[in-house]
Design a protein with these regions (language model features):
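Active-site C-terminal subdomain of aminotransferase-like
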Residues: 48-137, 141
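Short, well-ordered, mixed-charge alpha-helical segments that flank or form enzyme active sites
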Residues: 1-3, 28-32, 37, 51-54, ...
Length: 169
């Protein structure tokens, strides 16, 4: 549960000529995620965490640079189902039927995003932080410590040390 400094990591990755992939399965909807400002090439999430939607979808985004690499790869993707270049053709003139979309999940995500919009992003972020602080205070009261350093704890992923006395129960 450590909050990573993505802007600094992004700069180092791009300075080295590489591309940046970011996992926001837990974070999306719980803290600010600035895909374009942080120069993220590929990012993915899950709907079942801070988006408060049933599991089953993985929102993704690719930068133009990442899409260029995807569309011009030299080797064939071994899994037809995971071939992003075929998925990208849904929006082009060479549309290829890839699979039946999970319409019920898409509507579920739409409704979850509507609820976040109604609450307001800043209020949503503040709610997750309040809940984190309340949990942290309760855990501290019974002697449980966080694994991430103070100031680097991700509010929605609370990784803690298991007390030695209960490790073998």
């Amino acid at each position: 549960g450590a909050w990573q400094q993505i802007p600094e990591i992004s700069k180092a990755v791009h300075d080295a000529g590489a591309m940046l992939l970011v996992d926001t399965v837990t974070a999306l909807g719980g803290i600010p995620v600035e895909v374009d400002a942080w120069n993220i090439d590929a990012i993915y999430s899950g709907t079942q965490k801070c988006l408060s939607c049933p599991p089953g979808l993985s929102p993704t985004s690719f930068s133009p640079r990442a899409m260029d690499v995807i569309m011009n790869r030299k080797t064939k993707v071994q899994s037809w189902y995971l071939d992003v270049s075929m998925l990208a053709n849904y929006w082009g003139q060479n549309r290829v039927y890839h699979h039946t979309g999970p319409i019920n999940m898409t509507w579920g995500l739409y409704e979850a995003l509507c609820l976040i919009h109604e609450e307001g992003l800043e209020n949503c972020f503040a709610r997750h932080l309040r809940n984190h602080r309340a949990l942290k205070a309760g855990l501290a009261a019974i002697g449980i410590k966080y694994s991430a350093q103070e100031g680097h704890q991700l509010p929605m992923l609370n990784a803690v040390y298991v007390p030695f006395a209960v490790q073998n129960l």
